Amino acid sequence: MFLFAMGLLLVILQPSTGQFPRVCANTQSLLRKECCPPWDGDGTPCGERSNRGTCQRILLSQAPLGPQFPFSGVDDREDWPSVFYNRTCRCRGNFMGFNCGECKFGFSGQNCTERRLRTRRNIFQLTISEKDKFLAYLNLAKNIPSKDYVIATGTYAQMNNGSNPMFRNINVYDLFVWMHYYASRDTLLGGSNVWRDIDFAHEAPGFLPWHRAFLLLWEREIQKITGDENFTIPYWDWRDAEDCVICTDEYMGGQHPTNPNLLSPASFFSSWQVICTQSEEYNSQQALCNATSEGPILRNPGNNDKSRTPRLPSSSEVEFCLTLTQYESGSMDKMANYSFRNTLEGFADPHTAISNISQSGLHNALHIYMNGSMSQVQGSANDPIFILHHAFVDSIFERWLRRHRPMLEVYPAANAPIGHNRENYMVPFIPLYRNGEFFISSRELGYDYEYLQEPALGSFQDFLIPYLKQAHQIWPWLVGAAVIGGIITAVLSGLILACRKKRKGTSPEIQPLLTESEDYNNVSYQSHF
């Protein structure tokens, strides 16, 4: 009944947030290279009259890139978004959005001054009604068109440098599938030539911040289309799972009774159509995915290549990964050793942190294990398990941030693969976000994880941790000081005892006010560090 009721909202609710703003997907905006739409609240570009923001030229990072992409001027995603726009809204204070009409993550209220912290929960801890509501929200997103965003169906060159716009409407769920595809697609070099060693969302430092921003935008989109401001994406804790416990009709869809590669007809996910899964066809045609339906979701969990991924990740592998102190290292790609990012992403062995691209660990392991739509990078977001999986991966990233408390400078400023330097703007988001802006605690972005919350002691422990670390560093000195203090105390005690023995024969006028036994019974002692 709840699912039916949600279906009725399809003709009522409208979404927002994604890739190309509809109001900027026209010849005039493309030729002017400007995307500074008016805010509805006052009718001025970027809400300038209300002091929300101004239309400004985009300042691009000039930091050098790594050697992985040896071309320049051949891909629309280079120096994002300058091929399409060189002027966008720069929002002030806590305002955000392509027209500064929204609040930054973690803020709410008319003037975006109210802090708000939401909690992402384990999907198996949701009540039946909460779980059904989540599934209904996903189905709603799959069936309602985006009001504010469209997708590009051609390159800038194919658009004749903006004079012939090529954009298309898309539903809210598939908008995010397309964005994931667009960020990870190959570079089209002309003819039948492509460059595959490029990815703006994977295999480099931006993997974790990019997906963090991606989920936050997806989460906010669902909040908007449902009117449920408290909605958060649940996570699936897959550590030590023996099989795909989430793959049931009660949750994300069971297995088809006669075709193990399909979903059970009892799950409405079985009727979903996938997009952006035929990368070789796009490459041969030198075309972009245009969001045409390409068939049902494929999933055959556990029937993958066991030599590459023998099982789902374990708790011990996650714990080892969290001990790694370097966020990034070496070449800062899938060949990086002792890199927390590369180990969590799954290109390095989860027991040694040495790169091994013949195996798939941690994050990658789950994608391979699903053995279907989720196992191909560009189209993996078609399977709704993607959301649950990446929410848990993000929670591991959050654990590492809280444990090691890195400075922003730990995130590489230069020489990372294209699009992954700290100040690079993330492809393909408009409004613009830099990689470094999401290399911070989730609490600063307005959300937490149920299993990471520390109810009473959290804030106090956060306050103490830096001082405890300093104490740990000077511990040898503290021990030495304690030993010396003990010696001095012993010497002084001996001298005092000797003096007291001498005083036993003194006159009453100079006797102590308390006897030794009274001293012992009535004086309280405190120890100090």
Swiss-Prot record:
Topological category with respect to the lipid bilayer: Single-pass type I membrane protein
TM stretches of this protein: 477-497
Signal peptide bounds: 1-18
Organism superkingdom: Eukaryota
Alphabetized UniProt keyword annotations: Copper, Glycoprotein, Melanin biosynthesis, Membrane, Metal-binding, Monooxygenase, Oxidoreductase, Signal, Transmembrane, Transmembrane helix
EC number(s) from the headed UniProt entry: 1.14.18.1
Record: residues binding Cu cation A: 180, 202, 211
Annotated residues for binding of Cu cation B: 363, 367, 390
UniProt cofactor(s): Cu(2+)
Main subcellular location of this protein, as a coarse class: membrane
Region listing for Disordered, in residue ranges: 293-313
Biological role stated in the UniProt entry: This is a copper-containing oxidase that functions in the formation of pigments such as melanins and other polyphenolic compounds. Catalyzes the initial and rate limiting step in the cascade of reactions leading to melanin production from tyrosine. In addition to hydroxylating tyrosine to DOPA (3,4-dihydroxyphenylalanine), also catalyzes the oxidation of DOPA to DOPA-quinone, and possibly the oxidation of DHI (5,6-dihydroxyindole) to indole-5,6 quinone.
Record protein name field: Tyrosinase
